[in-house]
Amino acid sequence: MANWTQLGLQDASSPLMEELIYFHDYTLIILTLITILVFYGLASLIVSSNTNRFFLEGQSLETIWTVIPAVILIFIALPSLQLLYLIDEVNNPFLTIKAIGHQWYWSYEYADYRDLEFDSYMIPTNDLTLGNPRLLEVDNRLTLPSQTPIRVLVTSSDVLHSWTVPSLGIKMDAVPGRLNQVNFFISRCGLFYGQCSEICGANHSFMPIVIESVNFSSFENWVSNFLNE
């Protein structure tokens, strides 16, 4: 969950988010070095009064400023392609969830369990208890086991939505009439907050996502209690 005045990314709670943060830092270093080099060249050009009236062409210089940017782009593209593969790879998930976007709430279906489905609405500010985050808490949390491969099928019943949980590195569009899938692996137990990230109408800001990650035995107990209610 993001903190007040936080400037950086949220703490990673999945291997995918760890890789995304690493790629962000790696790319930022390259961009910083390029920015310093460009500003140094501009400053030298402004400050220096030396000119060369006989300098008409420079094949070597043109080769250098063509090859070096190409090499830099390759060094950025390779880890980026690796990340794209990891995002799309689904390897034998233990649990499959279907997340359906509505105006303006989410509903969840556990495909591996019969009759395990519910709607998840934001709790109004007046009904919050002490310690609950405003505009982020819901009446029914999505309970998932930690240390388990999970697949989520995302769709919508009306307009475009987007199912997003930043600390897990997840953002998947919910498109009417189409099933998109995303996979993740939660590294630790805890509460992970997200929101719809696609403008979907008047109450777009009021359809949060809350994932409660628990150990596997607690998850089995939760499923048993839910089905017995």
Swiss-Prot record:
Q: Which cofactor does it need?
A: Cu cation
List the EC numbers from the record: 7.1.1.9
Quaternary state and interactors: Component of the cytochrome c oxidase (complex IV, CIV), a multisubunit enzyme composed of a catalytic core of 3 subunits and several supernumerary subunits. The complex exists as a monomer or a dimer and forms supercomplexes (SCs) in the inner mitochondrial membrane with ubiquinol-cytochrome c oxidoreductase (cytochrome b-c1 complex, complex III, CIII).
Q: Which residues lie on this side of the membrane: Mitochondrial intermembrane?
A: 1-26, 83-229
Q: Where are the transmembrane segments?
A: 27-48, 63-82
UniProt cross-references to Gene3D superfamilies, sorted A to Z: 1.10.287.90, Cupredoxins - blue copper proteins
Q: Does the keyword Transmembrane helix apply?
A: yes
GO:BP terms for this protein? ATP synthesis coupled electron transport
Q: What does this protein do?
A: Component of the cytochrome c oxidase, the last enzyme in the mitochondrial electron transport chain which drives oxidative phosphorylation. The respiratory chain contains 3 multisubunit complexes succinate dehydrogenase (complex II, CII), ubiquinol-cytochrome c oxidoreductase (cytochrome b-c1 complex, complex III, CIII) and cytochrome c oxidase (complex IV, CIV), that cooperate to transfer electrons derived from NADH and succinate to molecular oxygen, creating an electrochemical gradient over the inner membrane that drives transmembrane transport and the ATP synthase.
This protein is called: Cytochrome c oxidase subunit 2
Q: Which reaction does it catalyse?
A: 4 Fe(II)-[cytochrome c] + O2 + 8 H(+)(in) = 4 Fe(III)-[cytochrome c] + 2 H2O + 4 H(+)(out)
Q: What class of enzyme is it?
A: translocase
Cofactor note as given: Binds a dinuclear copper A center per subunit.
Q: Which organism is it from?
A: Pisaster ochraceus (Ochre sea star)
Q: Which residues bind Cu cation A1?
A: 161, 196, 200, 207
Q: Where in the cell is it found?
A: Mitochondrion inner membrane
List positions binding Cu cation A2.
196, 198, 200, 204
Entry GO CC: mitochondrial inner membrane
Q: Where does Mg(2+) bind?
A: 198
Q: How does it sit in the membrane?
A: Multi-pass membrane protein
